[in-house]
Amino acid sequence: MEEGKMDENEWSYHGEGNKSLVVAHAQRCVVLRFLKFPPNKKKTSEEILQHLQNIVDFGKNVMKDFLGENYVHCGEVVQLPLEFVKQLCLKIQCERPESRCDKDLDTFSGYAMCLPNLTRLQTFHFAEHRPILCVEIKPKCGFIPFSNDVTHEMKHKVCRYCMHQHLKVATGKWKKISKYCPLDLYSGNKQRMHFALRSLLQETQNNLRIFKNGELIYGCGDARSPVADLKELAHHLKPFFFPSNGLASGPHCTKAVIRELVHVITRVLLSSSEKARAGALRLGLQGPRVCEASPFSRSLHNQGKNTSEHSGLPKGCLLYKTLQVQMLDQLDIEGLYPLYKRVEQYLEEFPEERKTLQIDGPYDEVFYQKLLDLSTEDDGTVAFALTKVQQYRVAMTAKDCSIMIALSPCLQGTSSDQRPVIPSSRSRLAFSVSVLDLDLKPYESIPHQYKLDSKIVNYYSKTVHAKDDTVRSTRFKEHEDCTLVLHKV
């Protein structure tokens, strides 16, 4: 960043989460990411600098090795003029969602992270004139717990995402339950993946967003009907997939365009990057490969068809690598929580050891190497407990990451430069795949995760599963009074 040339009018609001806010540059393919804090919990400039540097180091030394360097963009910490930051904050305030304004942008330290704009293709530093489409997917956890420490039998049958949906709707977080199940997307089976992606398009919640030329055009809003939204989305997407304009408008056009989008995303998700590293983890999928709550699986089950269709993911693709990192959670939160308590007890006795244990960093090669110890035999030591706690934090990070797929039509008669290309029915699309939201989950969040897990499972068991049992019981009772009488002929 060139300090003397910072103009807030060249930057626009891009989005925000619980802990940070992002602005994008109008011409250059870069974004600035600022930390956010509650008004009464300000941090010093030194603490903010260390926090941001830890994020960069974790991406560079841990996630790049696990996921592959082509997929992970670490960025760098930059120091900005305070006047620029304050003016920028004033400029974007009116664009922020009201629900996010409980925290303030850090305008005191001047530190931020400079990252590539992942809604653009990642082989260009400046915005291209050709149209660029970007699909952001938050796939969530792609496996069912296989740990023997799990006490709720339901957790061995239904995935966390599907169970959590019911609690979120009950508490008003979402209006309706999504048909999306992460296990369908991670199955590698194209039919299941297509169903999962269509389900995300019908009920995006905060798991899918679509950008066109860096501007959000779909997702993160439930005020309008999905049908109206999909019709408008198809209008935006038509030039990407049917450039000759051979399709008329109407419901058939909408279906054709959405079908093409789903097929292209599936192909991209199953593609491998030749330059990406193979990945250091070799964890086999041990739990069930089908979630009993998935509408796709239920439909097949009701038709008497095999529900265990699981083609498997290609080992070089990003979904496979993400799933491998997620499976560092070998013990589930139920098995992990007692180990967390062991570490906590040790820190109460020896608080000065917190730095030695690398709980707050540094996230270096030493930290990374300890994550590769996949032993599950507890020897009763703090070292074993700490390794499992750190693996759990990394796994939770992978369970909450986002995948960004950028697509752009290949111009006729031109080479694809360095970019891989995916064919669609009527066009060829250059693409890049990236992953973001890779901040290491905080050590302090483990007790919250333990309580939330219990809350999710208990609610699902008492309401949804109990209702299913009642329905099955009623069906049985309808027939139990029937008597077959045989008469001699």
UniProtKB/Swiss-Prot annotation:
Hey, what tissues is this thing expressed in?
In brain, it is expressed throughout the hippocampus (CA1, CA2, CA3 and dentate gyrus), inner layers of the cerebral cortex, and Purkinje cells of the cerebellum. In heart, it is expressed in cardiomyocytes but not in interstitial cells, blood vessels, or valves. Also expressed in testis.
Please tell me whether the keyword Zinc-finger is annotated for this protein: no
A GO MF annotation of the entry reads: molecular adaptor activity
- Which superkingdom does the taxonomy of this entry point to? Eukaryota
- Which reaction(s) does its UniProt entry say it catalyses? 1D-myo-inositol 1,3,4,5,6-pentakisphosphate + ATP = 1D-myo-inositol hexakisphosphate + ADP + H(+)
Query: Pfam families under this entry?
Result: Ins_P5_2-kin (PF06090)
| GO cellular component terms, A-Z | cytoplasm; nucleolus
Transmembrane regions: none
GO biological process: any one? positive regulation of transcription of nucleolar large rRNA by RNA polymerase I
InterPro entries given in the database record: Ins_P5_2-kin, IP5_2-K_N_lobe
Q: Where is this motif: EXKPK motif?
A: 136-140
Q: What happens when the gene is disrupted?
A: Death during ermbryogenesis before 8.5 dpc, suggesting that InsP6 is required for yolk sac function and development.
Where is this gene product found? Cytoplasm; Nucleus
Keyword entries, A-Z = ATP-binding, Cytoplasm, Kinase, Nucleotide-binding, Nucleus, Transferase
Q: Which family does it belong to?
A: Belongs to the IPK1 type 2 family.
- Main function: Phosphorylates Ins(1,3,4,5,6)P5 at position 2 to form Ins(1,2,3,4,5,6)P6 (InsP6 or phytate). InsP6 is involved in many processes such as mRNA export, non-homologous end-joining, endocytosis, ion channel regulation. It also protects cells from TNF-alpha-induced apoptosis.
User: What name does this protein carry?
Assistant: Inositol-pentakisphosphate 2-kinase
Source organism per entry reads: Mus musculus (Mouse)
